[in-house]
UniProtKB/Swiss-Prot annotation:
One of its GO terms (biological process) is double-strand break repair. It comes from Pyrobaculum calidifontis (strain DSM 21063 / JCM 11548 / VA1). GO terms for cellular component: cytoplasm; cytoskeleton. InterPro entries: P-loop_NTPase, Rad50/SbcC_AAA. It comes from the Archaea. One of its GO terms (molecular function) is ATP hydrolysis activity. This is Arcadin-4. Residues 205-253, 323-412, 450-618 form a coiled coil. It is found in: Cytoplasm, Cytoskeleton. Part of an actin-like archaeal cytoskeleton. Its main location: cytoplasm.
C-alpha cells in the first residue's frame, strides 16, 4: 500500500514560499488554532485528487488554495509502495488553470493521461478518501458526543450511504417548491372563481386576454377621438360666440329644434332609408291566417282583439297574444304527436307480437290436426268415448258368458271322450250304466249342438280387442283433440284482436301524418314570423309614423327660427356645436368605462393567469409529482434502513476483530451493532465478559472513540483501499485526559498497520504520543504572517 514519504508546499493556503516535509511512519503536527496544520492535509488531498472538501462543499473556492499575494500554488507528493515510487505534482493558477505531472517509476505523464493513471494507481476516489483515509474530528465527534440521529449520520458517512440523505434533501427541496407551486395554483383557481362571472362574460380566459389587448387599441383610438372632439367643440364655440345673444333669446325653440332634429336623424339612420309601412300588414295577415287555421284550439277572444285593434299599441299587444297562443298550440301539437307516435309504436309492436302469436297458433293447429281428425273419425264410428266404453263392457260381458258356455261343453266333451277311451260301463257322475256307443253319440251331439260356441268366442275376442284398441286410442287422442279445439278458439281470438290492432295502427298512422302536417304548417309560419319580426314590424311602423311627425315639426321650427333671424348658417353651427358637445360627453363617459373595464381585466388576468382547465391540470400534475416524490422519499428511507442493516451485517465480524485488537482493557470483550427497527438508527452495544450489554450512552468517551475508529478501520479494510496511511485531523478537539490517553494507546496499536498523520492543538496530547511512540516524527506548526513547519516540539 502507498505511504507518503515527502510533502512539498509552495504558496499553498497559509504557507508562503516553498516548504518541505519528510514523513515517517507516525507523524504528529502540533500548533495553535489557525497555524496551518490542516493546510498540510488539504495539500495532500489536493495533490491526489485535484479537489478539496471545503471546495466541494462550496465553503471555499479553488482559488482560495493559493496564498494571498501569489499567482500560483504548487503541491508535490512522493509516495512509496515497496520498490514502487509515485511522484505527484499539481500547480494551480489564479484563473483556475491547473497542471498535473505524475511520475511512476521514472515514467512521466501529464494532463488527462496523468489523471487517469493516478486514479488507477490510487484505486480510490475522493469520496472514499474523505470517509476512510482522512478522518477528521467531525466524523469521530458525531459518533462520540452526538445523539442517535447524529451518530447515524456519522456512521452513514463512513458507510458511504449519506448520499441518500443528500438525495432526500434534494427531493425535499423539490417538494417544497412543488408545494409552493401548488399553493400558487390554488390561489389562481380561487381567483378564477372570484372572477368567474367576468371571465364567462368574455367566453373564457382567452377571450378575456383578447379583450384586454383590444381595450388598449380602443382606448387609444377613443383618446384621439376625444382630443379631436375637444378641438371641434372649441372651434364651434368660437364661431357660436358671434350670435350667442340671439341664440339665448330663442333658446327654448332651439332646444326643441335640436331635440327633434337629433331624434329624426337617429330614427332615419336606424331605419336605413324609407320604411315599408305594409310590412306590418303582411305580418298581421300571416298571424290572422295561422290563427284561423287553428281557430278551434284558440280562445275566440284573441282573434277578436286582433280584428278590432284600433291603434298601434293595441295591435302590438293583440299580435303578441296571438303569437304566444300559436306557440302554445305548437307545443300542444308536439306533445300530442309524441303521444300518438308512442301509441303508434305500441300498436305496431302489439301487431307484430300478434302476428307471431297467430303464426305460432297456426303451427300448433297443424301439429294437432292429424290427431284431431283421427279422433273425429273414431267419434263418428263410436259416437262418444263413453258409448265406446259401454260397448266394450258389453262385448266383454258377452265374451265372458260365451267363454263359460264353451268351457262347460268342453268339459262335457272331455269327460265323454275319457269314458270312451277308458270303455267305462258306469257314468262317473250319476252312476248309471253306459255303453261306448252311447258315449260316442253324446260326443257327436255336443259337436253338433255346441260347435258354433267356440267360433263365437273367437269372434267376440276379436271384437273386444278391436274395441279396446279404439277406446285406448280415443283416450290418448282426447287430450290432443281438446287442445286442438282450444288452440283453434285462441287462433280465432288472436285474428280478431289482430284485425282490431291493425285498424288502430292505421288510424294512429293517419293521425301522425295529420299532426305532422299541421306542425309543419306552424313551423313554416314560425320560420317567417317570430317575436322579433313582430316587434320589428311594429317598431318600423311606429318609427315611420314618428319620422313623418318629426319631419313636419322640424320644418315648422326651422320656419319659426328663420322668422326670428336665425338663418341656416347660425342654425348649422349651433346644431354642430351641440352634436359635438354631446359626442364629446359620450366619448368621455365611454373612456371612463373602458378604463374601469381594463383595470378589472388586468387584475383578473394578473391573479388568474390561464384557463381553469389548464390550472386544474397543472395542479393535478404538481400534486401527482409531489405524491411521487413522497413515495420516492419513503422508498429512499426504506433503502437507507435496508442498506444500514445490510452493511452492519457485512462489517460486524471484521468490526469486532479490529475493536478487540485496538481495545486491550478487558472490560469490553465484544461490540454488537444493529439497526433500530422503528426509526432505522444504529444501535451499538458493548458486551462485558459476564455477557451484560451496555448501550453507547453508558460508555466512556474513550470506549466510544475505540468503537468509532474500529468501525472506520473495518470499513477501510473491507474496501481494500490501496493507500497505506491514515490522517487524523484534530481527532480529540477537547482536552479530556481520558480521551487523550485512550487515543494515544489506539495510535500505538494502529502504527503497526498504517502510516499515521495526526494534527492536534493539544500539547499534552502531543507529549503523550511522543511518550507512547518514541519513534514518532513531531512537527510544530507556527504562524507569523505565514505558516511554517519546524521539526520537533517547540516551546
Amino acid at each position: 500500500m502507498w505511504r507518503i514519504s515527502r510533502v512539498e508546499l509552495e504558496n499553498f493556503r497559509s504557507y508562503r514560499g516553498a516548504h518541505r516535509l519528510e514523513l515517517g511512519d507516525v507523524n504528529l503536527l502540533w500548533g495553535r488554532i489557525g497555524a496551518g496544520k490542516t493546510s498540510v492535509f488539504y495539500a495532500i488531498e489536493y495533490a491526489l485528487f485535484g479537489q478539496q472538501l471545503e471546495v466541494k462543499e462550496r465553503v471555499a473556492k479553488l482559488a482560495d488554495l493559493i496564498h494571498s499575494g501569489s499567482h500560483e500554488a504548487r503541491v508535490a507528493l512522493e509516495l512509496v509502495d515497496g520498490a514502487n515510487v509515485l511522484k505527484v505534482e499539481r500547480k494551480l493558477g489564479k484563473r483556475g488553470a491547473e497542471k498535473l505531472v505524475v511520475v511512476h517509476n521514472g515514467v512521466e505523464l501529464r494532463g488527462g493521461e496523468a489523471e487517469r493513471r493516478l486514479e488507477e494507481l490510487l484505486g480510490v476516489d475522493e469520496d472514499l478518501y474523505e470517509r476512510l483515509v482522512y478522518i477528521s474530528h467531525r466524523t469521530l465527534e458525531g459518533f462520540i458526543y452526538g445523539t442517535s440521529q447524529k451518530r447515524a449520520i456519522s456512521v452513514d458517512r463512513l458507510f458511504g450511504i449519506d448520499v441518500i440523505d443528500g438525495v432526500v434533501k434534494t427531493v425535499s427541496s423539490a417538494e417544497k417548491a412543488l408545494l409552493g407551486k401548488a399553493e400558487e395554483l390554488r390561489k389562481r383557481l380561487a381567483a378564477y372563481e372570484k372572477y368567474r362571472d367576468v371571465i364567462k362574460r368574455y367566453g373564457g380566459y382567452s377571450g378575456l386576454v383578447s379583450r384586454l389587448r383590444a381595450l388598449s387599441s380602443e382606448i387609444e383610438a377613443l383618446k384621439e377621438r376625444e382630443a379631436m372632439l375637444t378641438r371641434t367643440v372649441e372651434e364651434l364655440a368660437r364661431a357660436r360666440a358671434a350670435y350667442l345673444a340671439k341664440l339665448k333669446e330663442h333658446e327654448q325653440i332651439l332646444l326643441e329644434y335640436y331635440r327633434a332634429r337629433s331624434e329624426l336623424e337617429f330614427l332615419e339612420s336606424s331605419a336605413g332609408g324609407e320604411v315599408d309601412v305594409g310590412a306590418l300588414e303582411k305580418v298581421k295577415a300571416a298571424l290572422r291566417e295561422a290563427a284561423e287555421e287553428f281557430e278551434h284550439m284558440l280562445d275566440p277572444g284573441i282573434l277578436e282583439k286582433l280584428y278590432k285593434a284600433s291603434d298601434l299599441e293595441a295591435l302590438s299587444v293583440a299580435m303578441a297574444e296571438v303569437y304566444d297562443a300559436l306557440t302554445r298550440v305548437a307545443k300542444d301539437l308536439e306533445l300530442e304527436l309524441t303521444d300518438v307516435k308512442k301509441a303508434y309504436e305500441e300498436y305496431v309492436a302489439r301487431a307484430r307480437r300478434l302476428e307471431e302469436e297467430v303464426a305460432a297458433a297456426e303451427a300448433r293447429l297443424r301439429r294437432l290436426e292429424k290427431p284431431f281428425l283421427r279422433f273425429q273419425e273414431l267419434l263418428k264410428k263410436l259416437r262418444s268415448l263413453e258409448e265406446a266404453r259401454a260397448r266394450l263392457s258389453e262385448a266383454r260381458r258377452r265374451l265372458s258368458e260365451a267363454e263359460r258356455e264353451a268351457a262347460y261343453y268342453t268339459s262335457l266333451k272331455t269327460v265323454a271322450l275319457y269314458l270312451a277311451e277308458t270303455n267305462a260301463s258306469v257314468c262317473p257322475i250319476c252312476g248309471s250304466p253306459i255303453s261306448r256307443e252311447a258315449v260316442e253319440k253324446v260326443v257327436r251331439d255336443i259337436d253338433e249342438k255346441f260347435g258354433g260356441v267356440v267360433k263365437r268366442v273367437e269372434e267376440l275376442r276379436e271384437e273386444v280387442k278391436a274395441l279396446e284398441r279404439e277406446v285406448e286410442e280415443m283416450e290418448i287422442l282426447q287430450g290432443d283433440a281438446a287442445e286442438y279445439i282450444a288452440a283453434k278458439a285462441r287462433l280465432d281470438e288472436l285474428k280478431v284482436e289482430r284485425e282490431e290492432v291493425v285498424k288502430k295502427v292505421l288510424q294512429a298512422e293517419k293521425s301522425v301524418r295529420q299532426l305532422e302536417k299541421r306542425i309543419e304548417k306552424l313551423r313554416e309560419f314560425f320560420a317567417k314570423v317570430d317575436k322579433r319580426v313582430i316587434s320589428d314590424a311594429v317598431s318600423r311602423y311606429g318609427r315611420a309614423v314618428r319620422i313623418r311627425e318629426l319631419r313636419k315639426r322640424v320644418k315648422e321650427l326651422e320656419e319659426r327660427l328663420r322668422q326670428a333671424g336665425i338663418g341656416g348658417e347660425e342654425l348649422e353651427v349651433e346644431v354642430k356645436w351641440r352634436e359635438a358637445a354631446a359626442e364629446l360627453e359620450k366619448a368621455a363617459a365611454r373612456l371612463a368605462e373602458l378604463y374601469k373595464e381594463k383595470s378589472l381585466l388586468e387584475e383578473a388576468a394578473r391573479e388568474v393567469g390561464e384557463e381553469a382547465e389548464g390550472l386544474k391540470k397543472r395542479l393535478d400534475n404538481v400534486l401527482y409529482a409531489y405524491g411521487r416524490l413522497e413515495e420516492l422519499k419513503s422508498r429512499l428511507e426504506l433503502a437507507k434502513v435496508s442498506a444500514r442493516a445490510r452493511l452492519v451485517e457485512v462489517v460486524r465480524s471484521r468490526f469486532n476483530e479490529v475493536f478487540q485488537s485496538l481495545y486491550k482493557y478487558g472490560d469490553v470483550v465484544k461490540v454488537d451493532a444493529a439497526v433500530e427497527p422503528s426509526r432505522g438508527y444504529y444501535d451499538f452495544y458493548a458486551i462485558s465478559p459476564s455477557g451484560d450489554r451496555y448501550g453507547v450512552s453508558r460508555l466512556s468517551d474513550g470506549q466510544r472513540l475505540s468503537i468509532a475508529l474500529s468501525l472506520a478501520l473495518a470499513l477501510r479494510e473491507i474496501s481494500q483501499v490501496k493507500l497505506g496511511f491514515l490522517i487524523f485531523d484534530e481527532p480529540i478537539p477537547y482536552v479530556d485526559v481520558n480521551v487523550r490517553k485512550a487515543f494515544a494507546q489506539l495510535l500505538t496499536s494502529l502504527a503497526g498497520r498504517y502510516q499515521l498523520l495526526v494534527a492536534t492543538q493539544s500539547r499534552e496530547f502531543a507529549e503523550e504520543v511522543r511518550e507512547a511512540l518514541p519513534n514518532a516524527k513531531l512537527f510544530t506548526v507556527v504562524k507569523d504572517g505565514a505558516s511554517a513547519l519546524i521539526e520537533g516540539l517547540q516551546s
